[in-house]
Swiss-Prot record:
Protein name: Acetate kinase
Binding annotation for Mg(2+): 7, 391
Localization per record: Cytoplasm
Site, as annotated: Transition state stabilizer: 187, 248
Catalytic activity: acetate + ATP = acetyl phosphate + ADP
Keywords: ATP-binding, Cytoplasm, Kinase, Magnesium, Metal-binding, Nucleotide-binding, Transferase
Species annotation: Gloeobacter violaceus (strain ATCC 29082 / PCC 7421)
Positions contributing to ATP binding: 14, 215-219, 290-292, 338-342
Task of the protein: Catalyzes the formation of acetyl phosphate from acetate and ATP. Can also catalyze the reverse reaction.
Pathway participation: Metabolic intermediate biosynthesis; acetyl-CoA biosynthesis; acetyl-CoA from acetate: step 1/2
Amino acid sequence: MKVLVLNAGSSSQKSCLYDLPHTQLPQEPPQPLWEAQIDWPHGGDGAKLKIKTVHHRHEKTLQGGSRSEDSARMLETLYSGETRVIADPSEIEMVGHRVVHGGEAYRESTRITPEVKAAIDQLARFAPVHNPANLAGIEALEALLGPQVPQIAVFDTAFHSRLPAAAYVYPGPYEWLDQGIRRYGFHGISHRYCAERAAQILGRDLAQLRLITCHLGNGCSLAAVQGGFSIDTTMGFTPLEGLMMGSRSGSVDPGILIHLMRQADYTVDKLDHILNQASGLEGVSGISNDLRPLFKAIDEGNARAKLALDIYIHRLRAGIGAMAVSLGGLDALIFTAGVGENAAPVRAGACEALGFLGVALDPQKNNGRPRDADIAAADSAVRVLVIHTQEDWAIARECWQHLRR
C-alpha cells in the first residue's frame, strides 16, 4: 500500500511516499519512494523545491505562485516528470499528516473528518503558526485525491496527553485550566519514535524502561518516558517554554516581560518576536541560531559564542536532571534531531555533569558519527543512545496501523 506523509510547517513543507506491505510492517524504517521539501524564504524570493527519489534528485525555484500552488506543483512531481514514481494519484491509499496541536481531545492519531478539521481549526488559537498550515495541507490533499481516500491526523501533543496533573497544571489561578491553559508538550511524534526505537536497540520492553529523550534541533525539548508514555516534558502551553533553543529563549522569569512592558514600552508583538526569533543561541551569541558557526567562532576566541554554548549546555543538564527526578531513576538517555544527532560536543557537555546518575560516555563512540547506536562506556550504568528521528516514518506507521483496526 502506498502511504503519503505530509508535514506542513510555517516556512517549509516536507512530504514522503512509502510503499508498505499490507501484511506486516518492516522492522527497520524503509527508504521512501519519493521525498520532497519546499522552503519558503522570508523575503518572498521564490520557493525552493527539492525532490529525491531512488534514481533522481531535482532542485528548482518556484516563482510567482501562492503556497497552495507551490504545494500542488510539488505533489505533481509524484506522477509526472523525471521524479515520477506512480502513474496516477489514485495509487495513494492513505495520507498521514503531522498536526502540531491536538489539545485535550486528541490523545492518539485519528481519521480526519469534517469534525476533526473543525477542531484543528479551533485549536489554531493555541498554535496560530502551525495548525492553519496543517489544515491547509489536509484540504489540499482532499482536493487532489478526493474525500474517499482516508487521511490520518497524527498529533504532536498526543504522546504527552497522559501527563499527571501535577506536571500539566500551571501554578496560577485554577481558572486558567478552564481556559485550556495548561502544559501540552510538543515534539511528541519524535519523542515517541525515539523511545520505541531505543527499546528495540536495547532489546528491552519499552514498558519497563525509564528514558529521557532529548530532541535538540532549532526547537528543543526533553521528555521523561515511563511505561511507554511521556510523564513529564519541558515544553509547555507553547513550544517556547523549557530549554534554550536556536532562536527561542526557553523559560525566562515572567517578571522580565512585565518589567520591559512597564519600563521600556515593549508591546506584546515585540516581546513575541524577541522571545521566539531573536533569543536563544542567536540572541546571546549575536551570530546564528545554528551551532556550527558558533563552534567556529568559539575556536576563534569569541566570548559571546562561548557564553551561548555554556548557557545551552547548563540548561540542558538542568533539564535532564529534572526529568530524571520525575522518573525516579534512568535506564537510557537518548539524543536526537539535528543538534542531538550531530553535535558531539553538546552530548559530551551534557553527559559530563551526569556522572552522579551513572552516565559515562565512550569518547571514541561519541565522536564517531553514531546513528541508532549506543555511545555509553562499557561500565556506564545508563545507556546513552544517538537515534536518527524519523517522524515521517512514524506517521506512515500510524496510517498502516489505522488500516488494521
